[in-house]
C-alpha cells in the first residue's frame, strides 16, 4: 500500500481475519490506522455509530450496513480508506433471502475531486474528507472458515484494485 495512504477496517463476519492478514505484513503499521470487530448490532451502533434505522430497515447483513461501516470507520479515524465487511459465515444464521455465504464488502475511498485538492496540503490530508463508497455483494461457498477466508481475500483484492487506479 502507498506509504502515504491510511486504512481503517470494520469487520463483522470475518472476526478480525482481514486485520490479521494485513498485520502479518511487516510495516503494516505505516498504513493500518485502526481495526474494529463489531459483531453484534449493539457493537455496530456503539463502536461505529451505525444508525439503528439502517439496521432496522436493512439488517446487519446488507449493502447499506457494510457501506455505513466503511464510511464510519474512515470518518472516525480520519483515514484515506475504510473497509466494512458484514455477512453470514454460517453454518447457522441464514434466512431465505440471506443465505450462508452472503457477504457484503464495502470500501470507502476519497472522492476524486477531494483527492486532487489534498495532494498539495499535508494538513488537508489528515482532515476528514467526503468519500465515495463501493460495495460488493458476494456469495461464497464452503465452511465457515472458508467463507471468512474468501471474504478477506476479496476485500484485499478490492483494495488492491482501487489502489491501482
Predicted regions and their residues:
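Short alpha-helical segments enriched in small residues
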Residues: 1-113, 130-165
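Short Gly/Ser/Thr- and charged-rich N-terminal loops/segments
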Residues: 113-127, 131
